[in-house]
Amino acid sequence: DIPLLYGDFDDRVLGDLASGLAGGPSNAMAVFAVTGADEQAVDAGVSQLSEFLHMLGNPVAVITASGSTSMTRTMNLNYPLGILDMQRALSVCAEDGVAAVIIAMDDRTLAEHALESVNVDLLGTEDVNASASLNELKTRYAFVAEHDMSMTSSTPESDEMAADSPAMYDRVRLGHMSLAIAMVLAAGVRKANIKSALRVSRDLN
């Protein structure tokens, strides 16, 4: 006979189970998320942050409805991602040795509660009015934050540093670069390392 187990099998339990079976992949890498006022802003923010983290020497993965990759590997996923889909994707990233994953936090990419049992380290946006929606995002996508999270956005310091990058001649891209720098600073990367990467990038361009 096959034993039957009874209990309340809600999304939280499913997330814990899926994360456990996958080996807790979100604990094996830095998890960044980008949200914004529209799809284009989110995609651009994800792309710029990915490029900048790679510039700093990090193996990077990107999870977005516009095209998910784990380093150079294309991940063929069906969007919006559910709880099991997300844990499976993160597991692939962890197996590939990714140091940081960037998630597009929007409804195209994520289904409701898709981030159950996913530890998000940093959440960024270029929309300065979006900070009030942090609790709404937590409720909608159910991500875990192990500290008192606040929304990261561009600062005068990140604006100044971005003005020294190859994005200096493109006002729109400059905003994306400033957000990427602000998020990397918030993650604890030293300013000297950031300035050095920006200088090398500028010289190459």
Task: Place the predicted regions along the sequence by residue.
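Phosphate-binding loop of NTP-binding sites
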Residues: 16-170, 179-187, 191, 201-205
